[in-house]
């Protein structure tokens, strides 16, 4: 059944690691499933969000404003929506279904109740957030290196390899 498959997924999800089977069952009994078609958005930049979503089946892309390529693709067991749920700010990235996707939706009351009642869940959520920060640092470092490389290239004539007008002006 879907509940058995979802329980198995929760067992392998970093967010729910080491939660008791009873806690997982209670969580599932009050959660809802949301099905998305490819291209459908679960979260929209600028809108308010009061849920945390866990990918049960399929995958979603996290797409930042003004950037064509997805920032990250998340699959089974991974979560989205946690930042806007935790800080109450509008959503900072679109979350778009890549495939037919099923999401487990936990509303803010459930999430805050879990945080308050389970140090394990709170710790798991902190680990997920720390992983996201590390990933973003890596992306920023790579982007910064690439920008510096392009700046150097923009100061040299591609044909003659001599410094160009821009180099002289700076």
Predicted features and spans:
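Solvent-exposed strand-loop boundary residues in beta-sheet-rich modules
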Residues: 66-68
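Nucleotide phosphate-binding site architecture
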Residues: 17, 43, 61, 81, ...
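Short aromatic/basic micro-patch
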Residues: 35, 52, 73, 105, ...
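Cyclic-nucleotide recognition modules
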Residues: 70-127, 134
